[in-house]
Amino acid sequence: MDVFTVAAAIAITLSAVVIVVYFLHTTQPSPWSKTKQRLAYTRKVIPKKRKLPFKSLEHLILNSLDDFLPMEEETTVQDVAKFFARRGNEFSVYSIDWEQDVVVLIRPVDGADLKSNPFFRQAQRRNAAEVLCVPLEQLQEVASAVADEVAHVQEVFIFMTGRCGSTLVTRLVEATSVAQAVSEPDVFSVISMALHRLKRSSQHGQTPSHLGCPAVLSNEESTIALLRNVVTLMNYTLVTSDPRHRDVIFYKLRVETILFADLMVRAIPSAKTVFMYRNGLEVTESFNRALLQQSYVLYKVFRWGMVFLDLLHPDFFKYFGDDPRFSTVRQRGKGLFMLFAFWVGTMQCAADLQKRQPRHFFHAVIYYSALLSDKKKTFRLQMKKLGLKWSPEEPGEDTDKIKKALDEDSQAGTSLCASARKPGEKWAPDVSSRWMGQWEREYFREVCHCTGNEILGPDFLLPGTIV
């Protein structure tokens, strides 16, 4: 890079850091109580506006009760089980507030279609009109009240590396008559982050009582019960609010949730699982392009530093990056390392799950190139592997909806769309020159080498992959 380019990049970087520091230091105190709640309650809310240096950073911030400003007074719900059985089609699980010790559900504004957005968590946050907060101590009672209504539901959990076509698959599923899909409900990531922090602190010799650890996460049995109950509530909301009452539900989970995938299937033993992935260098480049708004100059500056990412969300990229196995890697803790470690760690988890629990992991394994080659054929094969009978030619299928899902950019209109397409615009492959070269490939192999001799590079393939 020439001196002017370097100067411009440094100026942009410093500006971003200043904005983030300002954002962090001007954050207003939370208007919500930070003490344990004994009774369920509802309260009208309006979404807060987030001020971020890059819009794409919103995808790194977990949903929380503090996303909203409370309006009016809260209303106590004396019999929350009966309330949810009657109005559960209106409220969807949003997050968990560990300080109030409640599961947070939201009711959207009238007429909002939360599943029309490529990311369910984002649609929930932007359209919330009211919250329902259920004490964790009462969650089992609420789940039991509706469990029989959704006992027949078939869950499908999609685990993935990110940037691999998983959003497209959820759009296709939602276009069918046989199943519905939810793209990245954030409550599972909230649980994953809490479990990760607990594990990391425990490795440093701290016991749960000294961590302020949520009691529900103090042992596997209660954690599994929490997951089961959350899924039950989500199933009830989705089935009862769906005009066709489709009872096969695909849950596309965020990347880090693979860390407790074994707990997910212990909570829901009948669930089917899918793993979707892509070449590690391609995943990293695609993420960088979206995050940095296609600026190669910023990529060159940021690849050796997390900068504002560390300030905004210090734990996100450390799910795998703080693994002691990577202690000998050059530039450990820097930006490119963290992204590479995220992919390598995810793939190692997937490989281990396949070997340890082949009955549960995975019923279908999809590589990005298969979708690029033939979306419809690959999707059809995935449905077959999951035991679902589906054909776009079957009576009752909306061929226009399916064609739209196949043709349009599934992330258009969101900040994670690397090409900044608007909703409804068609997808097209990126033909611009690559950011990742020989140096990145060699460094990627160095990161891979730390995990052993199984994953040798970014082009590693799992057994049974549809390519």
Model-assigned labels for residue ranges:
Residues 156-176:
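Glycine-rich phosphate-binding P-loop
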Residues 149-151:
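P-loop NTPase catalytic core of nucleic-acid-dependent motor ATPases
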Residues 22, 26-29, 46, 187-218, ...:
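PAPS-dependent sulfotransferase catalytic domain
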Residues 175-183:
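Post-Walker A helix-loop "phosphate-sensing" segment adjacent to the P-loop in P-loop NTPases
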Residues 153-155, 246:
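Pre-Walker A (Motif I) flank of P-loop NTPase domains
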Residues 157, 168, 233, 260-263:
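Short, hydrophobic/aromatic alpha-helical segments in well-folded domains
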Residues 1-147, 315-337, 344-367, 372-467:
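PAPS-dependent sulfotransferases, especially Golgi type II membrane carbohydrate sulfotransferases
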Residues 211-253:
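Intrinsically disordered, low-complexity, charge-dense segments enriched in Lys/Arg
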